[in-house]
């Protein structure tokens, strides 16, 4: 085999490999069971924040720490598991469900992607997340010659991701066969 970069080895076949992995996860009972087991072991029925802060950095005495931690954990729980799902920009999942979905994507595709959003809500918290299918991260034709962009990820000179090109719709979506990219 030819010695080449990991991107060169993987990116050309990424879509086919991911499609096969998703098909396997949907149609193979053993894989489906392993996926469910992974989600259950990592998250369980509900994600629970177990905060252990450094009290001196917060300017708190050790005696004050327990009350502060309890307050933070209760607020997190109210935000994360709100029945109206304000943690999800689409308002369809709780935080635990989003984490379980991310574990599933990571298990099948080796990656998961969430966009942090700011959206006013009745819950009192405006931070929410938008789940994005990893295959929607893609390089548009208009910038395909830009060497700082690979597979829709724009990187700085050190390789740190500084931006993403996201298809507004999945390329195989039923609603349309055309899609736009958003940076």
Feature locations, PLM:
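N-terminal-proximal low-complexity accessory segments that begin disordered
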Residues: 1-65
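Structured, mid-chain assembly/scaffold modules that mediate subunit interfaces
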Residues: 36-183
């Amino acid at each position: 085999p030819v010695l080449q970069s990991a991107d060169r080895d993987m990116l050309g076949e990424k879509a086919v490999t991911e499609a096969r992995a998703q098909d396997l996860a949907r149609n193979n009972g053993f894989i489906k069971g392993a996926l469910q087991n992974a989600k259950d072991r990592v998250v369980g029925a509900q994600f629970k924040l177990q905060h252990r802060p450094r009290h001196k950095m917060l300017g708190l005495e050790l005696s004050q720490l327990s009350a502060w931690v309890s307050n933070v954990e209760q607020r997190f729980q109210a935000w994360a598991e709100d029945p109206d799902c304000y943690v999800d920009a689409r308002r369809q999942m709780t935080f635990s469900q989003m984490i379980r979905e991310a574990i599933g994507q990571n298990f099948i595709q080796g990656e998961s992607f969430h966009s942090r959003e700011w959206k006013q809500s009745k819950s009192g918290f405006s931070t929410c997340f938008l789940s994005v299918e990893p295959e929607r991260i893609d390089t548009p034709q208009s910038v395909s010659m830009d060497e700082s962009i690979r597979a829709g990820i724009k990187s700085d000179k050190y390789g740190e991701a500084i931006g993403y090109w996201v298809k507004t719709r999945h390329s195989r979506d039923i609603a349309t066969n055309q899609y736009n990219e958003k940076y």
